[in-house]
A protein has these predicted regions:
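Short, well-ordered beta-strand segments in beta-rich or mixed alpha/beta enzyme
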Residues: 2-9, 40-74
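Weak global preference for isoleucine
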Residues: 2-5, 26, 30, 35, ...
Length: 101
């Protein structure tokens, strides 16, 4: 199993709108793609002194399933324009880990 982890940061003013966009539109769109080997997605949120950090954790059966989601350069972050508009900054690349236990 492969876990894909990505970080994005918003201002406090944009945090609720960003979370809503993810929950109501972006995550729904990912699920609707019915990618074989996609197992799920989680969203973490943490308030910081200068904004809000979000972490997405996606689970896949294999790197091939990750490629089906993200493309050949599977480490490249997938950040739709609506999300970019609400983010102050974000990781340009996602990290991938093999689950061993």
């Amino acid at each position: 199993m492969i876990v894909r982890i990505w970080h994005g940061w918003t201002t406090r003013a944009n945090a609720d709108a960003y979370e809503h966009l993810l929950h109501e539109e972006i995550f729904v769109g990912i699920r609707n793609r019915e990618i074989e080997g996609f197992r799920g997605i989680q969203l973490l949120r943490r308030r910081l002194a200068d904004g809000v950090e979000f972490v997405t954790i996606m689970t896949f059966d294999s790197l091939e399933a990750v490629r089906d989601f993200a493309g050949a350069d599977y480490e490249q972050a997938v950040v739709p324009p609506k999300a970019r508009a609400l983010l102050a900054r974000f990781d340009e690349r996602s990290a991938h880990y093999e689950v061993v236990i």
